[in-house]
UniProtKB/Swiss-Prot annotation:
Cofactor remark from the record: Binds 2 [2Fe-2S] clusters per subunit. Binds 1 FAD per subunit.
Protein name per the record: Aldehyde oxidase 2
Active site location: E1287 (proton acceptor)
InterPro entries linked to this entry: 2Fe-2S-bd, 2Fe-2S-bd_dom_sf, 2Fe-2S_ferredoxin-like_sf, 2Fe-2S_ferredoxin-type, 2Fe2S_fd_BS, Ald_Oxase/Xan_DH_a/b, Ald_Oxase/Xan_DH_a/b_sf, Ald_Oxase/xanthine_DH-like
Binding site for Mo-molybdopterin: Q116, C154, G821, F822, A1103, S1104, V1105, G1106, Q1218, L1285
Gene name of the encoded protein: AOX2
Binding positions ([2Fe-2S] cluster 2): C117, C120, C152, C154
Binding site for FAD: L270, V271, L272, G273, N274, T275, A276, L277, A351, S360, H364, D373, L417
Tissue localization of expression: Detected in kidney, Harderian gland and olfactory mucosa.
Enzyme Commission number(s) from the entry: 1.2.3.1, 1.17.3.-
Domain 2Fe-2S ferredoxin-type: 8-95
Primary location class: cytoplasm
């Protein structure tokens, strides 16, 4: 639809090509334009709020001051298309292409195995590319900063950082940039396993073929468009206006035009970076008829330095502010830069670099956000705001009155913020900033603070004091009364005590404060004051500002400089962020193995380069189909209610709306009895799908959902927590129970009995590609083509078939690749596919359904939260004789996979321990939350934490090291599990012993103890955990697989199998198998997709057996084909593969074969409590060392050593990637990830802004992974005796949790507190309970 007349022409460049647009809608973002209008789908959409980095592109503008183009990384989802006039945009397609030339950045991230599912990879590439364009030889600190705004759920970041490090000037690992030795060959502190000349000479550590990297030459990059240079240099910048259907965008060309516009439209918001307005518009549907962009006003970006301070234009970005501050700090005396240094420190943690490149100083100040990092510092630093209007200019203070929104101290109608003046600090003045956040990077603070003190010269007497906090109210809060009462005091501990009392009395945090966590925030108020006190003492001790004749002796006689002991220095330091290092060890292939045989070699993910160039096609990258419609879902806003009515009339009148899909439109089955596709009579949770809107565009569909009127009648009870469910006896299925021996009798014959509780929070899958599906109805025979992001296309096929009441053979489901799954794209994706299919049938047109991040998190469920209770009886030696564990999981409102999860949890609960008397019981609770579902590990990560917590408690009670108690209770010899399945624990002991040796646990524990004795405010902890993970489904039918292999007459081979590529590299492994069996190179082999039309009746790709079963099926097909070719090959042994294939065709020999693997026998009899539910086990061990900040609860991961039993690895690089990714995902579960719900059951932590998965800064500083040598791993069960590693590494992340617990115990010992403490129920494992536990 054409927009109203009067729009100007928008001119910008994309990948070197000029783009001219007249009818520009101000509501369209750069991301939408790139994907929809230009077809540049390499730029991905994952969150819509600028917080995940998948849509990162490079934005270049000509800077008049430096006479050079400025290249920055930005998130395209936040950039309004209207804002691009005069800019050049570079997407991943513009960096390099497989069809033309792959750029070194793209090549290195792929060859470094830095890509798994590949959905985040284009964003990673663009962040690295923008960094190199600005800093051709970056430092490692700059590398980490550049990637802080990019999220990855698969890899664990280590290989991505490794690829970036190859460009760094200060990197010297493994021979790069002039290093003479590999780190393996250098003597050190035990970081690396024994060297190549030692007992592990058959082990290999080279995952990255650095010698194959093409060099990078910065002089060969594309030039900035000369036309844009001329536009920037034009002395007259015209005003630009762009009109859309609902919004008009005006970009004035001069300050006078801006002020006049502001006077006429004082209510219109000013938009610079769109980092606040954009996400609000997306999440809240907030629309402003007029938007004013002052980005092109030079006066608003002017920087002036005078003798009294620094004046910075309001439109300067936060990234530019960092550069401005760095320059001033380097040029000015130290005493003048106190406020500047505090600001510079705070800026390093504000959002990600992409957002800092967009967000403006003025926007940050004027937002008055509660969680502001800068406003507390600016307030205490006595910053002033230069305001301007048509009536003139005025100056106001950024003080408590401005922050509180007092009218006389704020902007008046028609005014704008022109600049911010930051005064230079004075002699004897000290300014510091503080923050504590859920994550070290790219996270809003729980609490931030700015504090300033000025002393009477030559004394310790407080002359002026200012304290401000963010995160404790609706805006930045100051404490003027407390500060006033402390004036004239000396800087002593008595003053500190008084300050804490006064501040806690003045700065009150209401229980209903945004974000809650009142007790934790009050702890931080005091912690920051204490840290401020010590930092000022440290500065005074250094006599930094003293000049003759003023000396310490001329100070007041009532006070002397204290000599800060070294032990106190730990309280002064922030937790540092380091680029991780480490070694990845795996077994070399047999020297006798033919070089063309790829099995056992670290082959790059076969889609790696396509991921890195943006050429890998995901579901929503498929081109728009003729007459395609878009679907958006209408979901419940009540947790438990009767649906009185659904009125779509208003929605149907909106432009573009084609239909409303309700349960009445379903021709077949509406889901199951307890799990409806579309709600009918009542809703059971917030987020349950009621109906769907189908419209011409996705924007129209989403906007129309708010016009569907749903009337409810609330029902009781509303059950949200496990404790509520227990109280209401609200359960989804019968109790699952296993027993061994006689626990009651055993409890009578022990030295000690302990009882305890364990809480494990929920976890969001947070696959980078949200749920999405495209349904295309065909014109005859009720046929449908479905293109989906799913782990289980056969299940989607069945669900759609039953929903539409058509045979399975009319429904074909296609899966090219999936942008991460982790269990979340098994059952729930089928539900979405069925709803979209109903829309397609009703309208007779293709329907595309793509969930945004908030919708995905709201609807699809995640990992089951757990509440566990244990009773353990043990001897003084630490030997456990009896153990009784009761587990409850929060299953949500319907059954889904909850019964299977509780079964698997109970079956695997014993972990690595042989305890003669056991009783395990488990219940799945029914609550009014969205149904929780399958998730990597399937209950084991929650359940195993219970038994390991029990072991830790036993060790504390006995005064023994936890690893000694673990060893004492481990399986020793071939034995039977609690469910009476025999296995050999030999690989478990090898992993455990290897881990202890490589990590040097005794030596490092001694060093940690010595550190702890000297450091009251920083504590270190070490933990080692073993793992026995049973692989597979507990049902024989789920272990079967099929394959189809075609050999074409040119010798090329097409392989199809029933597994789905989720990022785990299953397609790569399958081609390695086919290459070995057919004896042809990988370059002749290809996998196109997974389709229910080629391989029917497939099993979900899950339970870590995808490569096992599909590998056997591919092997079977290839062996069939090779057997057919053998007579021809024997007749012509010198012939080529192509000649043999051609001869077979001439002799009418079939060159197509199916393969089939019947699977493993697996069963479980719950009545008898016995069976053989799993075909084999994966074993492993992990040791982690952490350091915690006792004042804030923050931690740093110093080192992790992992040893995994991978059998005979098909591809060590892929398997190590699975281990590292699972480990970090597990560390996230146990330490950073939090799901919060309102009392009404609404999800509060939706999207990456609130829900924090691990970032690159969360990787251990030293991360060593070893795949156990496979000498004794031969088994006929799996393909080439390999083992599935997709899930098992998840639990090893708990080693971080227990290391933190060990450090907290050390801190509590110092303070005379009990060591055996219970982690609070709220936010188990995050920094909040750790801080409170120490306090």
């Amino acid at each position: 639809m054409p927009h109203p007349p009067g729009s100007d022409v928008l001119v910008f460049f994309v990948n070197g090509r000029k783009v001219t647009e007249r009818d520009v809608d101000p509501e369209v973002t750069l991301l939408t334009y790139l994907r929809r209008n230009l077809g540049l789908t390499g730029t991905k959409s994952a969150c819509g709020g600028g917080s995940c980095g998948t849509c990162t592109v490079m934005l270049s503008r000509f800077d008049l001051a430096s006479r050079k183009p400025r290249h920055i990384a930005v998130t395209a989802c936040l950039v309004p298309l209207c804002s691009l006039h005069g800019a050049a945009v570079t997407t991943v397609e513009g960096v390099g292409s497989i069809r033309t030339r792959v750029h070194p950045v793209q090549e290195r991230i792929a060859k470094s195995h830095g890509t798994q599912c590949g959905f985040c990879t284009p964003g990673m590439v663009m962040s690295l590319y923008a960094l190199l364009r600005s800093h051709p030889q970056p430092s490692e600190e700059q590398l980490l900063e550049a990637l802080a705004g990019n999220l990855c759920r698969c890899t664990g970041y280590r290989p991505i950082l490794e690829s970036g490090r190859t460009f760094c000037l200060d990197s010297a690992s493994c021979g790069q940039h002039g290093a003479r030795q590999c780190c393996l060959d250098q003597p050190g502190d035990g970081t690396c396993p024994p060297g190549r000349n030692g007992p592990q000479a058959h082990m290999c550590s080279e995952l990255i073929p650095r010698t194959e990297f093409q060099p990078w030459d910065p002089t060969q990059e594309p030039i900035f468009p000369p036309e844009l240079m001329r536009m920037a240099e034009s002395p007259v910048q015209p005003s630009l206006t762009f009109r859309g259907d609902r919004v008009t965008w005006v970009s004035p060309g001069s300050l006078q035009e801006l002020l006049a516009l502001r006077a006429r439209h004082p209510e219109a918001p000013l938009v610079l970076g769109n980092t606040a307005l954009g996400p609000a518009q997306r999440s809240q549907g907030r629309v402003h008829p007029l938007l004013i962009s002052p980005a092109r006003i030079p006066e608003l970006s002017t920087v002036t330095e005078t003798s009294d301070g620094l004046t910075i234009g309001a439109s300067c970005s936060l990234a530019q502010l960092q550069d401005i501050l760095a320059k001033s700090i380097s040029q000015l005396p130290v005493e003048k830069t106190q406020t500047l240094r505090a600001l510079a420190k705070a800026l390093r943690s504000v959002a990600g670099l992409q957002v800092r490149n967009l967000a403006s100083l003025g926007g940050h100040v004027m937002s008055l956000h509660s969680y502001s990092d800068l406003n507390p510092i600016l307030a205490v630093g006595q910053a002033a705001l230069h305001l301007r209007s048509e009536g003139g200019a005025r100056l106001i203070s950024l003080d408590e009155h401005f922050l509180a929104g007092v009218v006389s101290a704020s902007l008046q109608p028609g005014e704008i913020l022109e600049s911010v003046h930051i005064p230079h600090s004075q002699k004897w003045e000290f300014v510091f900033s503080f923050r504590q956040a859920q994550a070290p990077q790219n996270a809003s603070p729980h609490v931030s603070a700015g504090m300033r003190v000025r002393f009477t010269e030559g004394t310790d007497t407080i002359e002026d004091l200012s304290i401000a906090y963010g995160g404790v109210g609706t805006t930045t809060v100051m404490a003027p009364q407390a500060c006033q009462r402390l004036l004239g005091r000396h800087w002593t501990e008595e003053t500190l005590d008084e300050a804490c009392r006064l501040v806690l009395g003045e700065v009150t945090i209401p229980g209903a404060a945004p974000g809650g966590r009142v007790e934790f925030r009050r702890t931080l108020l005091v912690s920051f004051l204490f840290r401020f006190y010590l930092q000022v003492l440290q500065e005074l001790k250094a006599h930094r500002f003293l000049k003759p004749p003023c000396t310490p002796r001329t100070l007041s006689d009532t006070w002397k400089y204290p000599q800060l002991p070294d032990q106190t220095l730990g309280a002064l330091e922030d937790v540092p962020i380091m680029v991780p290092r480490g070694v990845q060890m795996y077994e070399r292939v047999d020297p006798q193995q033919p070089p063309q045989d790829p099995v056992g070699r670290s082959i790059m993910h076969l889609s790696g380069l396509k991921h890195a160039t943006g050429e890998a096609v995901f579901c929503d990258d498929l081109p728009r189909v003729d007459k395609e419609l878009f679907m958006a879902l209408v979901t419940s806003t009540r947790p438990h209610a009767k649906i009185v009515s659904v009125d779509p009339a208003e929605a149907l009148r909106l432009p573009g709306v084609v239909a409303i899909v309700t349960a009445e439109d379903i021709p077949g089955t509406n889901g199951t009895e307890d799990d409806k596709l579309l709600a009918v009579d009542k809703v059971l949770c917030v987020g349950q799908v009621i109906c769907a809107v189908v419209a011409e565009t996705d924007v129209q569909a989403r906007q129309a959902t708010g016009s569907v009127r749903v009337t409810y009648e609330d029902l009781e009870p509303v059950v949200l927590s496990i404790q509520d469910a227990i109280g209401h006896s609200s359960f989804l299925c019968p109790e699952k129970k296993l027993e061994l021996g006689n626990t009651e009798e055993a409890f009578e014959d022990v030295d000690h009995i302990l009882e305890g509780e364990v809480h494990v929070g929920g976890q969001e899958h947070f696959y980078m590609e949200t749920q999405r599906v495209l349904v295309i109805p065909k014109v005859e025979d009720q046929e449908l083509d479905i293109y989906a992001s799913t782990q289980d296309p056969a299940h989607m096929q069945k669900t759609v078939s039953s929903t539409l009441n058509v045979p399975l053979n009319r429904v074909t489901c296609h899966v090219k690749r999936v942008g991460g799954g982790f269990g979340g794209k098994q059952g729930r994706s089928a539900m979405l596919g069925a709803i979209a299919a109903v829309g397609a049938i009703k309208t007779g047109r293709p329907v595309r359904l793509v969930l945004d991040r908030d919708e995905d998190m709201l609807i699809t469920g995640g990992r089951h939260p757990l509440f566990g209770k244990y009773k353990v009886g043990f001897m003084d030696s630490g030997r456990i004789k009896a153990l009784d564990i009761q587990c409850y999981i929060n299953g949500g409102c319907v059954l889904d996979y909850s019964e299977l999860v509780i079964e698997f949890l109970i079956l695997k609960l014993e972990n690595a321990y042989k305890i003669r008397n056991l009783r395990f019981r488990g219940r799945a609770c029914r609550t009014n939350l969205p149904s929780n579902t399958a998730f990597r590990g399937f209950g084991f990560p929650q359940g195993a934490l219970v038994i390991e917590s029990c072991i830790t408690a036993v060790a504390a009670k006995c005064g023994l090291l936890p690893e000694k108690v673990r060893e004492k209770n481990m399986y020793r010899t071939v034995d039977k599990t609690i469910y009476k399945q025999a296995f050999s624990p030999e690989p478990l002991h090898r992993c455990w012993a290897e881990c202890l040796e490589q990590a040097d646990v005794p030596g490092r524990r001694a060093l940690a103890d010595a550190f702890n004795r000297q450091s009251p405010w920083r504590k270190r902890g070490i933990a080692v955990v073993p793992m026995k993970f049973s692989v597979g489904f507990a049902a024989t039918s789920y272990h079967q697989a099929a394959a189809l292999v075609h050999i074409y007459t040119d010798g090329s081979v097409l392989v199809t199998h029933g597994g789905n590529e989720l990022g785990q590299g299953i397609h790569t492994k399958m081609l390695q198998v086919a290459s070995r069996e057919l004896r042809v190179p990988l370059c002749r082999l290809h996998i196109q997709e997974t389709s229910t039309a080629t391989v029917p009746n497939t099993v979900t790709t899950a339970a870590s057996v995808g490569a096992d079963v599909n590998g056997r099926a591919v092997q079977n097909a290839c062996q069939t084909l090779l057997k057919r070719l053998e007579p021809i090959m024997k007749k012509n042994p010198e012939g080529t593969w192509e000649a043999w294939v051609e001869a077979a065709f001439e002799q009418r020999i079939s060159l197509s074969a199916t393969g089939y693997f019947r699977g493993y026998k697996a069963f479980m009899d719950w009545e008898k409590g016995e069976g053989e539910p799993f075909p084999y086990c994966v074993f492993g061990a992990a040791c982690s060392e952490v350091e915690i900040d006792c004042l804030t609860g923050a931690h740093r991961k110093l080192r992790t050593d992992i040893v995994m039993d991978a059998g005979c690895s098909l591809n060590p690089a892929l398997d190590i990637g699975q281990v590292e990714g699972a480990f970090l995902q597990g560390a996230g579960l146990y330490t950073t990830e939090e799901l919060h719900y309102s009392p009404e059951g609404a999800l509060l932590s939706g999207g990456p802004e609130e829900y924090k998965i691990p970032t690159a800064a969360d990787v251990p500083e030293k991360l060593n992974v070893t795949l156990l040598p496979s000498a004794q791993a031969q088994t006929g069960l799996t393909i080439y005796s390999s083992k599935g590693l997709g899930e098992s590494g998840m639990f090893l992340g708990s080693s971080v949790f227990f290391a933190i617990q060990d450090a907290v115990a050390a801190a509590r010992r110092d303070r005379g507190l009990a060591e055996d403490f219970t982690v609070p129920r709220e936010d188990p494992g995050t920094c909040k309970p750790w801080s409170i536990s120490v306090a």
